Curated annotation (Swiss-Prot):
Organism: Vibrio vulnificus (strain YJ016)
Protein name per its UniProtKB record: Catalase-peroxidase
Cross-link position per record: Tryptophyl-tyrosyl-methioninium (Trp-Tyr) (with M-252): 98-226
Site (Transition state stabilizer) location in chain: 95
PANTHER family per record: CATALASE-PEROXIDASE, HYDROPEROXIDASE I, BIFUNCTIONAL CATALASE-PEROXIDASE
Keyword Cytoplasm in record: no
Pfam families referenced in this protein's UniProt entry, alphabetically: peroxidase
Gene: katG
Cofactor entry: heme b
Amino acid sequence: MEHKPTHTSGQCPVMHGGATSSNSSNVAWWPKALNLDILHQHDRKSNPMGADFSYREELKKLDVEALKRDLKALMTDSQDWWPADWGHYGGLMIRMAWHSAGSYRVGDGRGGADTGNQRFAPLNSWPDNANLDKARRLLWPIKQKYGNKISWADLMILAGNMAYESMGLKTFGFAFGREDIWHPEKDIYWGAEQEWLAPSGAENSRYSGERDLENPLAAVMMGLIYVNPEGVDGNPDPLKTAKDMRVTFARMGMNDEETVALTAGGHTVGKAHGNGNAANLGADPESADLEEQGLGWNNHKSRGIGRDTVTSGIEGAWTTNPTQWDNGFFHLLFSYDWWLQKSPAGAWQWEPVNIKEEDKPVDVEDPTIRHNPIMTDADMALKLDPEYRKISERFHKDPAYFSETFARAWFKLTHRDMGPKARYFGPDVPVEELIWQDPVPTGRKDYDVDAVKAKIIASGLSTGELVSTAWDSARTFRNSDKRGGANGARIRLAPQKDWLGNEPEKLAKVLNVLEAIASEFNISVADTIVLAGNVGVEQAAKAAGIAITVPFAAGRGDATIEQTDVESFEVLEPIADGFRNWQKQHYAVNPEELLLDRAQLLGLSAPEMTVLIGGLRVIGTNHGDNKHGVFTDNVGALSNDFFVNLTDMRYTWKPTGRNSYDIVERNSGNVKWTATRVDLVFGSNSILRAYAEVYAQDDNKEKFVKDFVAAWTKVMNADRFDI
């Protein structure tokens, strides 16, 4: 008789209806479907703090000096489960803060330290973030003690600041104000690679041509924060690495001097860890077993802590005194020749030739033992690249200048994604105004808004001109790093005034009129532009038979060209704007995906995106006055015609070219309207069609106008952190 195997694991007696993994999700079945989830992140359902919670109010209760004292005490309070190198956690805390902030990229403003995203996948499990889970666990007692009064996002950066101060650096300052998220971000594109640390020639590489890095990425590999410390694709060559550094740090918003300062300053303290076999490390935090309790890279096969820790695979300290801020990095870099060696873990590293015994750092556990210092390929680039070397030599000769430059660069690195100073909080906020903060003067609030509106109405500008100019001014806002927006009226300055998407000739005409009105009333052009847009919306609603007042908050200021980093603002130029049915050229990415990206950066929900599209189409704001998607015979009236005609089965849709369609009457065969993919997606995508049907209903004409005004006001005020 054949013996059949017995299943020893019991089956669950309940057939679960909840999809608790992604294996059978809609995305798995239809991977090319438009992912609207990026518009519905970080809502109240995932936030445990409640609707009434205000982090800014909690910060007012924080004893900042007590917190700083506790953090400094933590630095030298070594724990047996993860001992501090030389009895000081400074290097570990700095690396945690560096890697939290260093994921920022200027291309789309995503990444960075502003949300505390290092706690979640993928960042919590990136190879480059190995063992930073230990740093956060060391911080937990302090977070637990101060509770709601300090976010994880703020605490991680403040810990890095305090680490530097505890080792002798005078930091430039610190601002509280970063608010935690509660689940992984869904909108950030980290790269197309399907494996960690995939080389540049691998499938789905982020590089093309002669090492052209895909936008908006900054890191050279999936799973790295910036460049490969062993060299390009793990092959040591400092001059090639220098090229990678220049691209990567520029995409983080840093120039050459800041790049050298940050690299050297980051390696002035602490050490790299590679004294062991990396194969002995366990899974990363997201993959680790339940009993690991969210910790990863645990070594259960050997000691794996202290001097036997493996993290990057590179092994050693950069300086003689790794717990002290000094000029030791440049002293060693320029005092010795360096040659390539392999670490105990098998990683490439540079070590000095014939180094003096007293220049060697001592062992992390036994001060009677000394080891060679090390340099990464990036460190050697600071010596061998001609431009980097000039800067390095100046820092070497002038330690005070190096310290000041690093402190400023560190502040920029850790605060770049926080946006304007209006979001800063705390006693250590620097008074100095920095150009990378995109400063905007405070504007007037005490003026007769109705009188200004009357002047705008009598100006002769069309509804479409008023609305499109205000939209173009506000649409640059990025909720990712809080840059852009209507405040400052930088649409009248270079480079924005010349952007193709802003229709420079028409813009100049409109600005000429609005600037005269602003001058007459002694108010900001920024306020006047937004108020003019509001007037246009009110007139369009009136033309549709609905009286409504668009909310307006005065107080915007006008930035000057001296307050504007022209090169920095170039990254805000739109390559497409589905809201105005325009794109600069055809791209590999579909127009509706570009629309979704802009909506997400503006902080819009899918219903808000939908209602804005429908309203802007019928008002007549299309770029170049193109007629695509203008499904109405009454242009200029804020009606729901776009949705009514989009969902009307009297019409059929026929492609006429790439991103071009005709709307044809079924009975006559006559072409009624034309459209783009951005228009059609609101009838094609099942979710967006559901929203479109709501606004097409006969009983929702007034709701449509009210919802449009609410979404419009949200965009106009997106950068008003002062209200």
